[in-house]
Regions:
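Mobile-element integrase/transposase regions
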Residues: 1-30, 38
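Generic recognition of stable, solvent-exposed alpha-helical segments in well-folded globular domains
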Residues: 9, 51-54, 78-82, 111, ...
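Mobile genetic element proteins and their domesticated derivatives, centered on retroelements
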Residues: 12, 31, 37, 56, ...
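Active-site beta-loop-alpha junctions of metal-dependent nucleic acid enzymes
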Residues: 24, 32, 41-64
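Short, surface-exposed basic-aromatic patches at helix termini and helix-loop junctions that form
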Residues: 32, 58-64, 82-96
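RNase H-like two-metal-ion nuclease catalytic core shared by retroviral integrases
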Residues: 72-74, 78-87, 94-120, 135, ...
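Short, solvent-exposed helix-loop connector elements
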Residues: 118-134, 153-157
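Charged, gly/pro-enriched flexible loop segments at helix/strand junctions
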Residues: 140-171
Length: 172
């Protein structure tokens, strides 16, 4: 895999369960390109394979480049026969993070708070109307985030005169 070219997408879900995991509630599927930072979201009814697949298919069409690699965590919503079959049918490679390694999906994990929680908060969403509204929200967030928000990536560190480390970023 050439991780320096667009198309290497990380995927993750965020639960909109409020203070309790009891019952059915919406989840937001986030997919982020590792090179460009292009991020797309859609909310689905739950983590069932049919909803996750519908979300992946919808989001894949929103990226301005084809998906080459689908990189997810080890959750059952992504690691199953349905998702694997869908990816194989489209000649898309599937990668997964290492179990219990929190930094394996740093690009998409950073979007959970920066994008999803910032706009949808920590509330519970469990009705059809709320699900529809969340998806309308993600379309607007996508426009602002992908077209009007510059992104910078850390490329290294330097040491200041007083001996502190300072992160260096690339140009936006």
């Amino acid at each position: 895999w050439d991780e320096s070219r667009p198309g290497f997408l990380e995927a993750d879900t965020v639960a909109h369960c409020g203070p309790t995991l009891v019952g059915e509630f919406a989840r937001t599927l986030t997919m982020t390109d590792m090179v460009t930072g292009w991020t797309e979201n859609c909310s689905v009814r739950n983590n069932a394979a049919k909803w996750i697949l519908a979300g992946v298919e919808a989001l894949t069409g929103r990226f301005p480049f084809p998906m080459v690699v689908f990189d997810s965590d080890c959750g059952g919503e992504f690691i199953n026969h349905d998702v694997a079959g869908w990816l194989q049918d489209r000649d898309i490679s599937q990668a997964r993070s290492r179990p219990y390694q929190k930094n394996d999906q740093a690009h998409v994990e950073s979007k959970n708070n920066h994008v999803v929680r910032k706009h949808a908060f920590y509330w519970r969403y469990d009705t059809d109307g709320e699900l529809k509204l969340l998806n309308e929200l993600w379309e607007l967030v996508s426009l602002r985030l992908n077209f009007f928000t510059p992104t910078k990536k850390p490329v290294g560190y330097t040491t200041t005169r007083d001996g502190r480390k300072k992160r260096i970023y690339d140009a936006p």
